[in-house]
Structure formats: structure tokens, C-alpha cells
Amino acid sequence: MRTTAVILSGPRDLGLQTIQLNEPAPGDIVVEITHSGISTGTEKLFYTGQMPPFPGMGYPLVPGYEAAGEVVEAAPDTGFRPGDRVFVPGSNCFAPTDAGPIRGLFGAATKRLVTPAHRAVRIDPALEAEGALLALAATARHALAGLNHVLPDLIVGHGTLGRLLARLTIAAGGEPPVVWETKAERRRHAEGYEVIDPATDQRRDYRSIYDASGDPKLIDSLVMRLAKGGEIVLAGFYTEPVAFTFVPAFMKEARLRIAAEWQPEDMVATRALIESGALSLANLITHTRPASEAAEAYATAFSDPDCLKMILDWRATA
């Protein structure tokens, strides 16, 4: 079985190639991908060559961990059947070539993939491109959920993650948070909350500040906005060291928490919120390109400040 996939052969060396898939094992399903998302966190690090080494890392690789598509092959014991609409967080299903392995890191940017059935999530057939956003929505939910976690009253950044954090806060019954955004064009599409220029905000009593900007240089300024005993949650992805001045944080008795990737229970809860209508995925995708233009799409996703979320459309790809 063959597929057309995005292959990142090295830093900034990206294009489409036809490659071989591993044959499905018992318990696997085969999914025809219609849409995949481009992450400006981990994928950008692979693309630029800045990803710190970890076991299993290497080029060439198939990037991506956000994909939506339809099941085309499934045994009855998998719980799926052909035609089911699913979200898949990628797969490592690519057969090695004579030159060596092709790594699935994380393997979602492909026309077709093979995955263990338990990794796929059945979604509403009405979710087209938005179906690829489930991982990001579940990541936002993971940052908010948990014992003793305080819902944000300030969110920094009105990108895709910031919007999801704000929407989920309201869906959880919290007060509408204040959202900071320095770019005027990104202050649009607020749904039930206020987005402001941080320069106009004089508050110094925020109990819980969620940073969704990924800017490691903001911590000191955020500490000054905390109430005593308040918390800063690092919900973004940081490519440079995060540091802060100790004395102001000491005076505020500030707490710092890092939110990582989603877990299965986050995905279950997020899907339920979407299906019930409590969480909207509208106005999050700003750019869509056919998969045949993958090289241009990745360059735009990582360089255009107006691009909140880029989606590759695989439907016309053979």
C-alpha cells in the first residue's frame, strides 16, 4: 500500500513524495486523510532544525499530529467501519526505503495512514477541516483541567490556542477572561470575552494568568500583574530558555505551572463539548492550501503573522 506524504528530509527541505506504508496489523485501521493541520510549535522546530535531540528523532520524517479523515479499512473487532469520520494524531506507519527509515514525527501529514484503532477518535461527519483541530482543543483543555487548577482571568495571546482557552473557560462556567493581544488584527472574533491591547490594562490583581504566546521574555512582566499567591501557567511552546527575576516573584509568592500535551481523557471531554455545542471551533482556521502546495503552506504557516492556523487539504491528492 502506498501513500503521498509530506517528507521533511532536513531543515527547510520539504516536499511531497510517494512512499510505502506498512501493512495493517490486527487491530489496525486504514484512514484516508482529508485535512491535516500544521503546528507552529513542534513542527516548526523540526522544520527549522531547532528541535533538541530525543530518542527516535531524525530525518527524513513525516510531520504533523493533527489529521481528520475517513476510515477505508477496518476489521469488525476494531469498533470502526468504513466511512467513519475520525481524528488521528498521526502514525508511525511508513515502510523504510533503501536509504533508511522514514520516521513518523508524528506522521499525520499524509494522504493515507495505518494506525492502531485505539488511537483514532470518531468525530461528527460535519466536522471537515475543523476536525483536525481536536488535538489543539484537547491541549487547551488539558491546561485548564485538573484538581486545584484555577481558570484563567487573563490569557496572553489571541492566537488559536488563546482563543480555545478563552472559549473553554466560558464553557467550564468561568467568568469571561481578559485576553491580551498586541496585534490589532488578531483582536477580532472574540466570542463572549474581551480582547485588549496590554498597554491599556492597568490591573495588578490577576489570580491566574495563562500564557499562550510562547514568548519566554514575558514572565517578569506577568509576575507584576499577579495578585499575591497567583499562578502563571505556561501553556505555549517555548523555543528559548524561560527565566524570571526572583525577587518580584518571591514578593508575590508566585506559582508557576507548565501545561504539556493532551491525554486521552482530555480528548474524550473535548469531543463531548464540541458535540454538545458548548465549544465552537469556528474562526480558528485562517489559511487552507491544497496538499500539493505543502512547501508553500509550511513556509507561510511559520512566517506569516496573519496565519493563525494552516490546514492542508488532501482531497484532491492522488
From Swiss-Prot:
Keywords assigned by UniProt, alphabetized: Bacteriochlorophyll biosynthesis, Chlorophyll biosynthesis, Oxidoreductase, Photosynthesis
A GO MF term: bacteriochlorophyllide-a dehydrogenase activity
CDD domains to which the protein is assigned, alphabetical: 2-desacetyl-2-hydroxyethyl_bacteriochlorophyllide_like
EC numbers, comma separated: 1.-.-.-
UniProt keyword tRNA processing present: no
Pathway info: Porphyrin-containing compound metabolism; bacteriochlorophyll biosynthesis (light-independent)
Enzyme superclass (EC): oxidoreductase
GO biological process: light-independent bacteriochlorophyll biosynthetic process; photosynthesis
Record InterPro entries: ADH-like_N (IPR013154), BchC (IPR005903), GroES-like_sf (IPR011032), NAD(P)-bd_dom_sf (IPR036291)
PANTHER family with a match to the protein in the record: ZINC-TYPE ALCOHOL DEHYDROGENASE-LIKE PROTEIN C1198.01, ZINC-TYPE ALCOHOL DEHYDROGENASE-LIKE PROTEIN C1198.01-RELATED
NCBIfam families: bchC (TIGR01202)
Function text: This protein catalyzes the penultimate step in bacteriochlorophyll a biosynthesis.
Protein name per the record: 2-desacetyl-2-hydroxyethyl bacteriochlorophyllide A dehydrogenase
Organism encoding this protein: Cereibacter sphaeroides (strain ATCC 17023 / DSM 158 / JCM 6121 / CCUG 31486 / LMG 2827 / NBRC 12203 / NCIMB 8253 / ATH 2.4.1.) (Rhodobacter sphaeroides)
Gene: bchC
